[in-house]
């Protein structure tokens, strides 16, 4: 699988972030894997990306976002609503995949109804999950 430039993990759970970061690094999925521990931190990161020079060493525009649904203060749905409303002139939106332990049918139905959401996967990431995401959404990256 070919590397993406940047993957953003948005999750408040440190063990999950540790595992997902480890797996993405081990599988050589991206040049940069960035962790945001809250929706607010992720929005701040995107604002910095928009303000940073194109070749910034600190902020890398994500190609893929793995987003937790259940987080305190700002859940994944609230983050996504604010993310979609950011000023996108000259910038491309990242592919968003929810990573969750939620078994609520409402979450699956909402994810399927939103064109901004590319999928909903169970936590934690696995090599098979990554392979499926690459086959579906990044076929140019064999």
Label every PLM stretch briefly.
Residues 35-49, 76:
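Helix N-cap/capping motif at the beta->alpha junctions
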Residues 50, 54-66:
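Active-site beta3 strand of CheY-like receiver
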Residues 71:
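Receiver (REC) domain active-site loop signature in two-component systems and cognate sites
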């Amino acid at each position: 699988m070919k590397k993406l430039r940047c993957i953003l993990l948005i999750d408040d759970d440190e063990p999950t972030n540790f595992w997902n970061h480890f797996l993405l690094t081990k599988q050589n999925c991206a040049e940069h894997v960035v962790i945001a521990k809250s929706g607010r931190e992720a929005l701040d990161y995107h604002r910095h990306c928009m303000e940073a020079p194109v070749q910034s060493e600190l902020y890398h525009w994500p190609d893929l976002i793995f987003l937790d649904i259940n987080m305190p203060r700002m859940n994944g749905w609230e983050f996504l609503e604010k993310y979609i409303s950011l000023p996108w002139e000259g910038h491309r939106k990242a592919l968003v995949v929810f990573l969750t332990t939620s078994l609520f049918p409402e979450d699956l139905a909402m994810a399927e109804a939103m064109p901004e959401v590319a999928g909903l996967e169970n936590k934690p990431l696995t090599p098979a999950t990554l392979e499926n995401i690459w086959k579906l959404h990044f076929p140019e990256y064999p």
